[in-house]
Amino acid sequence: MPVDQEKLAKLHKLSAANKVGGTRRKINKKGNLYNNNDKDNTKLQAELHKLHPMTIENVAEANFFKKNGKVLHFNSAVVQIAPQCNLTMIHGQPKENTLNGLYPSVASQLGSQELEYLTGLAHNLENEQTVLDQLGDRCSETKQQVMNS
C-alpha cells in the first residue's frame, strides 16, 4: 500500500501540535544546602565511646606535626586517650600553619630533645625548598633553551 507523503507530513504536523500527556519537565532536586556530617559524627562518637576514653583536662592547645612541614594547630582542644587501644583523640577545629610560623610560640613549651628535633626538621625543610627552587630554575632554563632553538 503506497503512502502519500503529503498526508504523512500533515499528520506529523497535527500530532506535533496535539501532544498527549503532560509536560516532561525535570524536577530540580536541591542538594543538601547545609553539608553537615552529624550522622557520621554521631556514629564515630558512638564507636569511640565504646573504648571508654579518659578526657585530659586543661589542655590549652595541641599541635600535630606533619612530615611535609605543616602543623595542625588546635586552640582549646579536647584531648581524650584510650590507653588500652593506644589511641589519642584530639577534638576541635584545626588551623594548618607552617612550622616557621608556630616555632616562636611553641619553642618555650618544648624540652631540649623536641627542640632539637624541630630545629632539624626546619633545616631539612629549608634544604628541600632550596633544592626544589634550584630544580625549578633548571627546568625554566631548559624550557627557554628549547623555545629559543
Swiss-Prot record:
PROSITE patterns: NAC_AB. Disulfide bonds: none annotated. One of its GO terms (cellular component) is nascent polypeptide-associated complex. Transmembrane segments: none annotated. Keywords: Cytoplasm, Nucleus, Protein transport, Transcription, Transcription regulation, Transport. GO terms for biological process: 'de novo' cotranslational protein folding; cotranslational protein targeting to membrane; protein transport. The keyword Cytoplasm applies. Residues 38-103 form the NAC-A/B domain. SMART domains: NAC. CDD domains: NAC_BTF3. It comes from the Eukaryota. GO terms for molecular function: unfolded protein binding. InterPro entries: BTF3 (IPR039370), NAC_A/B_dom_sf (IPR038187), Nas_poly-pep-assoc_cplx_dom (IPR002715). The keyword Plastid does not apply. It is found in: Cytoplasm; Nucleus. Acts as a component of the nascent polypeptide-associated complex (NAC), which promotes mitochondrial protein import by enhancing productive ribosome interactions with the outer mitochondrial membrane. Also blocks the inappropriate interaction of ribosomes translating non-secretory nascent polypeptides with translocation sites in the membrane of the endoplasmic reticulum. BTT1 may act as a transcription factor that exert a negative effect on the expression of several genes that are transcribed by RNA polymerase II. Belongs to the NAC-beta family. PANTHER family: TRANSCRIPTION FACTOR BTF3 FAMILY MEMBER. Present with 1820 molecules/cell in log phase SD medium. Part of the nascent polypeptide-associated complex (NAC), consisting of EGD2 and either EGD1 or BTT1. NAC associates with ribosomes via EGD1 or BTT1. This is Nascent polypeptide-associated complex subunit beta-2. It comes from Saccharomyces cerevisiae (strain ATCC 204508 / S288c) (Baker's yeast).
